[in-house]
């Protein structure tokens, strides 16, 4: 059975890999010259199931107003003429209730923890190397109020059985020695020891090589134009003026997925949240991060690779604008310079931006659609790297009609009101260990 995967970011590539392992004949098509060249290229580098939470949360609307008034704001909104921007923001606001937050977070944590386990298994089985570290994530609080508010997050962690440590200043210096000289500006920290880090683009590149060894064909530099359908079935994809056909189709085009779905009558509320990153060569390894740091004040992650520091964050609701805003670079340089003033050479840093495909409820869209042979794997927001392996494996199981290892409930597009008359509902296997 032939499967055509549209998109070769970390989501499309993991989908292709697990489909090939399941015995499918897989072809991946992308407009870029290689895998992982868009949103997967220079993200923050975190694999953080413990921090899998929707942006839509109680209190966020008020926080957003305050953020918009700050010079180094983690959020910016640029009005466009696109009605989808306003519809998406309205849907997100409707999800900022305690009940919806709890439902959405459970879905995200379920998939994220499974995905981390799949990544661990993949690393053991294949030896794939991607500058990965399994040294946890440390969330820094600059104020006592932030530290006090962490009690709500800790309650959720305890309920989910996620290990954690609450650190004082001495504890921060113990797990991140390079911060010893700046602990005076910190009130405390929350550490999740089971979180991981790694270069997402490097992982995607090497997994694609392994997929090729399994028979996957990658076709680059090809423009995906539109999907053709007849009744409840996709009959082909127009690629550079040629109609390509397969038995099953997987749409993994991130923020661009809705553009192909809309003509089919499928509404996918996936909207781009623009993020930025700075990649800094390490000048003094002893003064660089050990793993990943999250700065709660600025909503920025600072991650250690082998010889580089990746500083990533921000959220701009600005449509598909990919221009580089120098003020965002200034903010990232300020934060890394504040915490790790001797760690890296900012004069040699590279600046990047990407579009995170985000749903209003934070949960990605993974699974079947109203069209019987079309499947989606998109909308992972800031957690594409965290959720990639689990999403790819879950999707492959669903397409193969195999019993998945976790429940797929609430993950497909039917939660937005799209009918699922032809979706295959498969009971999950016993809880994944």
From Swiss-Prot:
Q: Which reaction does it catalyse?
A: a D-alpha-amino acid + A + H2O = a 2-oxocarboxylate + AH2 + NH4(+)
GO CC term (a single one): cytoplasm
Q: Which residues bind FAD?
A: 3-17
Q: Give the EC number(s) under which this enzyme is classified.
A: 1.4.99.-
Cross-referenced Pfam families: DAO (PF01266)
Output one GO BP term.
D-alanine catabolic process
Q: What PANTHER family has UniProt attached to this entry?
A: D-AMINO ACID DEHYDROGENASE (PTHR13847:SF280), SARCOSINE DEHYDROGENASE-RELATED (PTHR13847)
Protein name as it appears in the record: D-amino acid dehydrogenase
Species for this entry:
Pseudomonas syringae pv. tomato (strain ATCC BAA-871 / DC3000)
